[in-house]
Amino acid sequence: MLAVAPVSNAQRRRPQTPPELHGSKASVEKMYDFALSHHLPFYLTPANLDDAIAKGRLVPLTGDATYELTRGVGFSYATREAKQFVLAFAPQYLTACGTPLTVTSAARPMSRQPHNANPHSVHPTGIAVDLRRPSAGPCLDWVRGALAELEDKGLIEATEERHPVHLHIAVLVPPGTSVVLPQIVNHLAAVKAAPSVLHSAR
């Protein structure tokens, strides 16, 4: 008989964050280097952001049946690629979680960055969005797995932030390229439903 170590109640309750979502200096630099290598401007002031909006470099996030924005979103604009990510990810989130995705932040000029923001934050470019992190449970499990999979595919760089709690997503799709996401809902559901390889001998 194959012995399996018992799992404590504390271990069962403690949510597990995939390694891909752990924040690090390397992760920050990857996002920053992407922005620099694609010559993305870092907007300094709200006026600079308004100019980018007027020129069509940033597009509005308006919300729909699959995603919503909190009132705290000061500038509900992002690059076309970041918006395409939200539009593609939100329906899968709704299917998996039964509730709309919530965007808590998007493009943000450097002069409006919070005091604890990293100097190399890419929010001033518009390629990043912050999402509300679901409470512990099946939805959070799905979100973590989905973001880790998309990061492994090189489409995004994601971090599960703690102060304040949220999910930071930078969309690493070159400007002018369409964002196409795999069907993560069905894939992760199939993985979760697969029988465990650890069986007691009969």
Each predicted region: which residue ranges?
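Envelope-exposed proteins and targeting segments
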Residues: 63-67, 71, 97-99, 125-129, ...
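A mature extracytoplasmic/lumenal domain signature
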Residues: 65, 105-108, 133-135, 173
